[in-house]
Structure formats: structure tokens, C-alpha cells
């Protein structure tokens, strides 16, 4: 996203469109599936819910500091412990529940910045920061739409589902762009596109994330476990990337803070590793 000055919705709409060729190739490899009875209603609910989550995420990052909004995404695996059994997304074992909670708290601690007014500061800010409240809703929506992904997967296959869903999300993004533009929330300059290269990269990495997400769901067959595993990626995002970038002279200390806070974040990393070991060995 840092490679383009285009509005987030513009980036998302073009990003979804650039995923289409990858999805078509993936569908060609796996073949067109037999569509089950629950496929279309899963898509029907997924698109508007994920669109709402997208809007809330954009507004949250506009209204509140990232440090107060990021921790809420860690709550999705915990919410899935309730939503997944109700929606057919899998029943974790008791130790599996413990592992998911370990991962949840670990991801949360990774995103809590040293020097805040306590580790519960993001929750305390709910009444003060609308962005915090928005991201809490995003985490709740995530606990629903991930189960819808699993339902759609069981009633078709991964590439067919994400191709249909991705094209509909691109259409919704375009509609949202027009609405935002008419209300003056998008400047004309934010439509400026000097190069399609950033959008191609965004589409490629979006495809990669979706591909591994759907493939993991196909084999794990347990939504809380899969999302808990997915959230462990923040170890690389918040710790690994910070250390690597902080060590490169090219960035001239721009990521020095991430390196300095490594010790503070090791506790979160330890919880995540412990949680995943519990899930793998006893889940």
C-alpha cells in the first residue's frame, strides 16, 4: 500500500481485479466443482459483511492510532471458539481451546506498545476512540466470514469460490468509491494512477494470502485452529520484518523502534509458539 498514493478503496478494487487472472489459472488446475446447496448463501452473506468490515477498517485507521486498533484483530480466534461450533466450522478440544487462547493473547501482546497506560489500554480507549470500537466490530465480523469461507469451500472448491467472491468484492469496492467520492471523502488526486505495478503486487500478494488460507482450511477442517495459525504470521510482520528492516542501512534507522522493543514483544512470541504447539500436538 505504501507504493501508491491512491485511496485505499481504489487500491482494493484494482487489487481484487488483478487477482482474477490468478484465480482463473487456479480454477483451471482444480476444475469447475459441483456446487452444493449452501454455496450461494455463503457468498450472499460474505460479500456485504466483508464490505462492512473493509469500510470499518478504513475508518478506524483514519480516526485512531494504529497502536490502538491493531490488537483487536487478535480477538478473532477467540470469537471463533463460539461462532465456529454454531456455524459448523469445527469443535476444538479443550486443550485446543487453550492453544487458541494462548495465540490470541500472544498476538495481542505483540501489538501492545511499551509505554502505553497498561496492557488493557486499547480496551479502555473504546469509549474514547471510535476507531477502537470499529476494529472490535471487524474482529467480530471476521469470526463470521471465516466460517462462511469454510462453508463455501465445502460446497464448491477454493478457486471457484474466491473467483466469484473476488469479482463481487471488486464491484462493491467500485460502488463504495463512487459513494465516497460523491460525499467528498475521496479527493480527485486519490484517483491518480501513475503505475499499475503497485496494484499488480497488491493483487499478487492478496492472491497468495487467499490461496494459503483456503488451502489450509481444506486440510485442517477446523476454522479456529486455521485462523490461530494464520495469526502467527504477525511474528514475522511485527518482529521479523522490523529486525530485518532496522538492520538495513538503506532505511537509516527508520525501523529502530521495532528493534528496540523486541524484548518487550518476546513474551507475546512465546505465547504464540506455546499455543501453536498445543494445537499441533494436542488439538
Which residue ranges define each predicted feature?
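Cytoplasmic-side transmembrane-helix entry/capping segments in multi-pass membrane proteins
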Residues: 5-17, 64-76, 96-100, 125-136, ...
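Loop-to-transmembrane-helix transition segments
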Residues: 14, 24-27, 33-56, 128-140, ...
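Loop-to-transmembrane alpha-helix entry segments
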Residues: 37, 73, 86-118, 246-278
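Specific alpha-helical transmembrane segments that line the substrate/conduction pathway
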Residues: 46-50, 61-107, 162-171, 221-243
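Flexible interhelical linker loops that connect adjacent transmembrane helices
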Residues: 113-133, 183-194, 253-256
Amino acid at each position: 500500500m505504501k507504493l501508491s498514493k491512491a485511496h485505499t478503496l481504489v487500491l482494493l478494487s484494482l487489487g481484487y481485479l488483478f487477482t482474477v487472472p490468478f484465480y482463473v489459472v487456479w480454477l483451471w488446475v482444480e476444475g469447475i466443482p459441483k456446487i452444493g446447496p449452501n454455496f450461494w448463501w455463503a457468498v450472499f452473506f460474505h460479500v456485504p459483511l466483508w464490505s462492512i468490515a473493509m469500510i470499518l477498517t478504513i475508518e478506524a485507521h483514519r480516526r485512531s492510532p494504529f497502536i490502538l486498533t491493531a490488537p483487536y484483530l487478535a480477538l478473532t480466534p477467540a470469537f471463533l471458539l463460539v461462532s465456529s461450533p454454531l456455524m459448523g466450522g469445527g469443535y476444538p478440544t479443550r486443550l485446543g481451546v487453550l492453544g487458541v487462547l494462548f495465540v490470541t493473547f500472544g498476538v495481542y501482546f505483540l501489538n501492545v506498545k511499551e509505554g502505553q497506560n497498561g496492557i488493557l489500554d486499547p480496551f479502555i480507549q473504546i469509549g474514547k476512540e471510535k476507531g477502537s470500537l470499529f476494529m472490535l466490530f471487524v474482529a467480530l465480523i471476521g469470526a463470521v466470514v471465516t466460517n462462511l469461507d469454510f462453508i463455501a469451500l465445502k460446497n464448491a472448491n477454493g478457486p471457484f469460490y474466491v473467483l466469484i467472491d473476488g469479482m463481487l468484492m471488486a464491484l462493491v469496492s467500485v460502488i463504495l468509491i463512487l459513494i465516497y467520492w460523491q460525499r467528498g471523502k475521496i479527493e480527485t488526486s486519490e484517483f491518480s494512477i501513475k503505475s499499475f505495478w503497485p496494484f499488480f503486487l497488491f493483487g499478487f500478494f492478496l492472491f497468495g494470502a487467499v490461496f494459503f488460507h483456503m488451502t489450509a482450511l481444506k486440510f485442517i477442517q477446523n476454522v479456529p485452529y486455521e485462523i490461530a495459525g494464520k495469526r502467527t504470521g504477525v511474528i514475522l510482520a511485527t518482529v521479523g520484518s522490523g529486525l530485518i528492516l532496522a538492520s538495513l542501512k538503506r532505511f537509516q534507522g527508520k525501523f529502530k523502534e521495532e528493534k528496540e522493543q523486541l524484548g518487550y514483544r518476546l513474551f507475546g512470541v512465546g505465547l504464540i509458539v506455546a499455543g501453536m504447539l498445543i494445537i499441533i500436538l494436542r488439538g
